[in-house]
A protein has these predicted regions:
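A short acidic, Gly/Pro-enriched loop at the edge of an enzyme's catalytic core
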Residues: 108-120
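C-terminal helical/coil "lid" or tail adjacent to the Rossmann-like core of SAM-dependent
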Residues: 4-13, 18-22, 205-268
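A short SAM/SAH-binding and catalytic strip from SAM-dependent methyltransferases
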Residues: 118-132
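Core SAM-dependent methyltransferase catalytic element
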Residues: 199-201, 274-285
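Conserved alpha-helix/loop element of class I SAM-dependent methyltransferases that forms part
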Residues: 28-50, 64-68
């Protein structure tokens, strides 16, 4: 679920298990806000039929954002490779009565015929895929109708990864590989542009917009514990035995780093707000 780079099985006793439920609590309203910000870049839907593909649908953030914009004359196919995630997505379809169907598919090898969809969205997806998501983009383009629209995004700035790195540097020996090292390449919109062009879209048909995404989180200590649990052990080094004794120091370092990020705001009800920035690409076939 959290894409570890190491085969080590050790985990600190304090670490929360990386389940879809934990992921859902971590992202809170963040994925919905990212999807909504991304969809705002394509304008309103007209009255014609919309056939939307939510690629790597996860728990349904993209689907929720789509249905908030268009209720009628729309069909949504949500695809993901993870069975546990798809089960929750199906529950969300039933609960929210989305006009959607959940299907298990590899984003890099879709089973849909050519020119199936009018729109597709890959929400917070590319940077977790092999080959930087190029193969998935090729499949998205293949399955789009001529004139169809693909919406893709990546984080231009995230407050969470630097906070994780601060904790790792404070509690681990110098030279220990950092979790999610290399993600910073996605902060450059030219990298995202290059990936999309490698996926087959013509350069003049790819437009970019940068969006601020304000995410509400609960108790800061709880949030820091969750993201350190979810990401802290994902480097090539995995979890270290010393991480168990240094657990509180690491979590406190995450808390401190988060409060110092641009856009951080403490709310009155015990909640907090942190700010992400996203590159949103709108590509037309």
């Amino acid at each position: 679920m959290n894409a570890p780079e190491s085969d080590r099985t050790f985990s600190p006793k304090q670490a929360l298990k990386p389940t879809p439920e934990l992921y859902s609590e971590i992202v809170g309203d963040g994925m919905e806000r990212l999807a909504a910000a991304s969809l705002s870049c394509i304008g309103s839907f007209d009255d014609s039929e919309v056939i939307f593909h939510d690629v790597g649908c996860g728990l349904g953030a993209g689907t929720e954002a789509i249905t908030s914009l268009k209720q009628d004359n729309i069909v949504i196919k949500g695809t993901d490779i993870n069975d546990d995630v798809l089960e929750i997505y199906r529950q969300n379809i039933a609960k929210s009565q989305w006009p959607a169907e959940a299907l298990k598919m590899d984003a890099s090898n879709l089973e849909f015929p050519d020119e199936t969809f009018t729109h597709c969205i890959g929400n917070a997806m590319l940077f977790v895929l092999p080959n930087d998501g190029v193969d998935a983009i090729k499949e998205m383009r293949r399955t789009l109708k001529q004139g169809g629209t693909a919406i893709l995004n990546s984080w231009a700035h995230t407050p969470t990864i630097p906070a994780i790195h601060a904790a790792a540097k404070k509690t681990r020996p110098a030279g220990t590989p950092l979790p999610r090292e290399g993600l910073d390449k996605w902060e450059d919109k030219e990298f995202l542009r290059d990936v999309i062009i490698k996926g087959g879209f013509e350069p003049e048909k790819v437009n970019f917009i940068q969006k601020d995404v304000h995410v509400t989180i609960g108790d800061l200590k709880r949030f820091a514990t969750m993201i350190w649990s979810f990401i802290g052990g994902t480097s090539k080094a995995g979890w270290l035995e010393s991480d168990e004794e240094n657990w509180d120091i690491a979590v406190n370092a995450v808390v401190e780093a988060l409060t110092q990020t641009e856009g951080y705001k403490k709310l009155e009800d015990g909640k907090n707000k942190i700010m992400f920035q996203a590159h949103v690409a709108v590509a037309t076939k």
